[in-house]
């Protein structure tokens, strides 16, 4: 399980214990969730990084790529990893 899966598992343990108890194989669930999050972050960061301005220098490029990664990670963390305990629709979607 990667760090995204471990972070999600801890979040569910703290904020969604009843829902966590319904998962037959938490290890497999959070392993897959972590892998999905990592893939989604990479894809979103890559898409965001495509917006390259002309005459960009090395430092500007590094800042753009770092910002793209951070934005993608923030979005995915909110959607998949640190799901709002009050958002029953998102929780149901994650549980399948």
Segments predicted by a language model, with ranges:
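Extended, charged helical/alpha-beta scaffold domains that provide interaction surfaces
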Residues: 1-96
């Amino acid at each position: 399980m990667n760090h995204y899966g471990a972070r999600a598992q801890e979040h569910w343990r703290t904020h969604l214990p009843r829902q966590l108890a319904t998962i037959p194989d938490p290890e497999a669930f959070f392993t897959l969730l972590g892998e999905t999050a990592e893939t989604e972050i990479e894809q979103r960061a890559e898409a965001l990084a495509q917006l390259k301005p002309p005459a960009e220098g090395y430092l500007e490029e590094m800042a753009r790529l770092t910002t793209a990664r951070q934005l993608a990670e923030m979005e995915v963390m909110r959607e998949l990893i640190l799901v709002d305990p009050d958002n029953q629709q998102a929780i149901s979607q994650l549980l399948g």
